[in-house]
A protein has these predicted regions:
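Ligand-binding pockets and gating/stacking loops
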Residues: 1-492
Length: 492
């Protein structure tokens, strides 16, 4: 093939022959790799066909409070009683033996472990925060806490899937996919759903956490790397000019569209048409959106980009979480609908899974997130973006009140844990719900995580009962078949 003349005899063979030939020289976008990775050569989900342009903006069901959402996911399960859920009774009874009911766990009795952190009330609202997060403590009046969440799984993999997709098994669309499906994207030149991972490793269950499940692949998350070039394979192959590549993609999409007209239920192909067009646009838009050199030195300092406390030895660049928070702000500023940042990777001490010692775990991870999150909230506010951006913080579950092992470790606990929300439509300076006096189990105003999902959808302008996708003979919903309750106490 003569790459200098891409229009010569482009349609001489069959469509499949054309795609196969182009796979060898489709520039850095790697057509064949994209087709294979996205399952083009495999089976196609038997789902309803999406709209002709899957990511076109859609009208919300409700008066929308927030236009975008940034989900800060603390992988491993942060310890609520060492960060936000102050439990003086637990501290008083430190070292005493207690029998605490557990489901599907071997340990139900042991010694209570009080927190070594110092708690203080902050802001006009008097919200409790420990000394592990001194910068974030200054933002307490922006946060709405739900301290009585509970979930169904003690295992990281299934708990993460449930927090992301509402189910403890793979194959279901993630919340970002539901938002993309329900609202579309405000910027057709950037992904509507972006995921940024910790350079220490991706979370357990991997891409299933940001999968579109049985929905078209157009709604799945696009992963940005933590360091170096965030999106691989965007640079054109040497000798291929922008007009040549534009002609090439137009021809591919024309052939795909003709094929789609004959096979209207082929949702994977429809997603690929949109993906190739987006990939071409990303070659121009992504470098600008991700260029932190355009930010002022004061902004970089605010996010901790030059602060060694926000760094860690396995990073691919300085202050990865601070960089990701700043990139998240730049993305929502440009109309990206949903950005999810995972903090914590690998195993145990590389994430929030504090089996071997909660104090050491907090000393590692809290400085990495404290300054960047406080900066993100303050930056969104000073730019007038906080009212239209929903920020969500939390993990897949919390930690137990009992000590694990011979030190100061804590085991998993889905029976009672804390999340906080800030921004669009949220009543800042609020603490809703309570765990028991030991922080072990949700006790007052208990809410299953399906209620959190319904609340997030509501804040984004979507009615959980109307946001449905027909699959398997049913109108499927993020919140499942059990009717959820919107957590009204968090709403402004």
């Amino acid at each position: 093939m003569n790459t200098g003349r891409p229009n010569q005899n482009l349609c001489a063979g069959t469509r499949r022959e054309f795609l196969w030939q182009m796979g060898a020289g489709f520039t850095g976008l790697a057509l064949t790799a994209l087709l294979d990775q996205d399952g083009f050569f495999g089976s196609v989900a038997n789902a309803a066909a999406p709209a002709s342009t899957p990511m076109s903006p859609r009208i919300a069901h409700l008066p929308r409070h927030a236009k975008s959402c940034i989900f800060l996911f603390m992988y491993g399960g942060p310890s609520q009683m060492d960060l936000f859920d102050y439990k003086p009774e637990l501290n008083k009874r430190h070292g005493q033996t207690a029998n605490l009911e557990q489901r599907r766990r071997a340990v139900s009795a042991g010694k209570l472990l009080g927190s070594k952190r110092t708690f203080q009330q902050y802001g006009r609202s008097g919200q409790w925060c420990s000394d592990a997060l001194p910068r974030l403590a200054t933002q307490m009046d922006k946060l709405a806490f739900i301290k009585s969440l509970y979930a169904d799984s003690f295992a990281h993999g299934s708990a993460m899937l449930q927090m992301n997709s509402g189910r403890i098994i793979q194959g279901w669309p993630s919340m970002g996919s539901w938002l993309s499906y329900g609202l579309g994207s405000m910027n057709q030149n950037l992904p509507g759903y972006v995921v940024m991972l910790d350079p220490r490793g991706g979370p357990i269950s991997g891409a299933a956490n940001w999968s579109s499940g049985f929905m078209p692949a157009a709604y799945q998350g696009t992963v940005f790397r933590a360091g170096g070039q965030p999106i691989l394979n965007l640079d054109p192959t040497s000798g291929i000019t922008a007009p040549m590549q534009r002609d090439l993609i137009t021809t591919v999409n024309t052939l795909n569209t003709e094929h789609l007209a004959k096979h209207p239920g082929y949702s994977e192909l429809q997603a690929r048409i949109a993906s190739y067009e987006l990939a071409f646009q990303l070659q121009t838009t992504a470098p600008e959106a991700l260029d932190l050199a355009k930010e002022s030195d004061a902004t970089k300092e605010m996010y901790g980009l030059n602060d060694p406390k926000t760094d860690h030895p396995l990073a691919l660049g300085p202050a990865p979480f601070g960089r990701q928070c700043l990139i998240a702000r730049r993305l929502v500023e440009r109309g990206v609908r949903f950005v999810q940042i995972y903090h914590g990777g690998g195993h145990q001490q590389q994430n929030w899974d504090a089996h071997n010692g909660v104090e050491e775990n907090l000393k590692i991870h809290c400085p990495e997130i404290d300054k960047p999150i406080a900066a993100l909230l303050a930056d969104l506010e000073q730019r007038g973006m906080l009212d239209e951006t929903l920020v969500v913080w939390g993990g897949e579950f919390g930690r137990q009140a009992l000590v694990q092992g011979g030190g100061d470790g804590r085991d998993h606990n889905p029976k009672g844990f804390t999340y906080w929300l800030a921004g669009g439509g949220v009543k800042g300076g609020t603490s809703y719900g309570e765990t028991d006096e030991l922080g072990h189990e949700a006790a007052l105003d208990k809410h299953h995580i399906r209620d959190l999902h319904a609340t997030i959808l509501h804040l984004m302008g979507l009615d959980h009962s109307k946001l449905t996708y027909f699959y398997g003979g049913l109108n499927q919903k993020l919140t499942g078949v059990i009717e959820p309750e919107i957590i009204r106490g968090l709403l402004a």
